[in-house]
């Protein structure tokens, strides 16, 4: 598994995870709750994958949407869908750590980008790329692993994400995990991936070096989410959540 491109090998099944995982709706609600008004805005979707958020921004009225991802397989899927829907979204294969400016965007979306920084240097590089592509009054909406999450306090198996191990690595934490598909018929084998967790202080320092200030937010779990699942289903998500969001603007 390529350390920097873990999703290339599982691109064909990742959409099935997104279609099945109950917390995806929470993620979508959180991202757009923080994004605010979309109509007429330009959007850059970093770590866009197969284009889920790119298309959601476009359907909510964004005037221009550009997606970028390191995975050639993900971008191929995204482009095929864009041709199918005729939505005019641009998709590019890019390593965000070494990406040129594609313009100045009102909103930069980064769902599950920063947890792919394999070092503090890469974390800083990602924030610099954001700063180089963000309009002066724009904002970054990011979704990533919760810095306070601890495997010893509960796994995420209810949410189709089985975390196998947690270890110290390069000043942060490395989580080895699998997407699972227990309800698929015929069943699919687990899809392995990794995440790197950096502290709030490390995020703050890296973003500040790029001229950005950071504000953390919890996922917007609703009462209807709770009511639609068996009792206790969301307990780990509420008490030891593995997900978090943050917003960045220029200082």
Give the label of every model feature segment.
Residues 1-38, 52, 56:
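Conserved class I S-adenosyl-L-methionine
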Residues 124-136:
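A short glycine-rich, Lys/Arg-flanked "PGG" loop and its adjoining helix->strand segment in the class I
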Residues 109:
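A conserved beta-strand element that flanks and buttresses the S-adenosyl-L-methionine
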Residues 112-115:
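Short catalytic micro-motifs in class I SAM-dependent methyltransferases
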Residues 141-206:
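SAM-dependent methyltransferase
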Residues 202, 206-251:
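C-terminal lobe and adjacent flexible extensions of AdoMet/dcAdoMet transferase-like proteins
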Residues 44-46, 50-98:
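Class I SAM-dependent methyltransferase SAM/SAH-binding core
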């Amino acid at each position: 598994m390529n350390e920097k491109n873990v999703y290339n090998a599982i691109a064909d099944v990742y959409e099935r995870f997104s279609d099945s995982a109950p917390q995806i709706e929470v993620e979508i609600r959180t991202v757009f709750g923080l994004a605010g008004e979309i109509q007429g805005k330009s959007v850059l979707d970093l770590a866009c994958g197969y284009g889920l958020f790119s298309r959601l921004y476009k359907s909510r009225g964004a005037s221009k949407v550009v997606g970028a991802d390191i995975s050639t397989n993900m971008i191929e899927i995204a482009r095929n869908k864009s041709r199918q829907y005729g939505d005019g979204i641009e998709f590019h294969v890019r390593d965000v750590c070494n990406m040129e400016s594609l313009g100045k965007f009102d909103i930069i979306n980064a769902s599950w980008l920063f947890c792919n920084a394999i070092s503090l240097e890469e974390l800083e590089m990602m924030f610099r790329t954001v700063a180089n592509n963000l309009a002066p009054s724009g904002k970054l909406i990011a979704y990533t692993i919760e810095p306070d999450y601890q495997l010893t306090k509960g796994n995420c198996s209810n949410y189709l994400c089985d975390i196998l191990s947690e270890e110290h690595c390069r000043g942060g934490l490395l989580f080895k995990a699998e997407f699972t598909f227990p309800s698929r018929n015929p069943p699919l084998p687990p899809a392995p991936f990794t995440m790197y967790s950096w502290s709030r202080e490390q995020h703050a320092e890296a973003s500040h070096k790029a001229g950005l200030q950071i504000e953390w937010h919890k996922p917007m779990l609703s009462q209807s989410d709770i009511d639609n699942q068996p009792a206790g289903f969301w307990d780990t998500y509420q008490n030891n959540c593995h997900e978090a969001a943050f917003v960045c603007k220029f200082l």
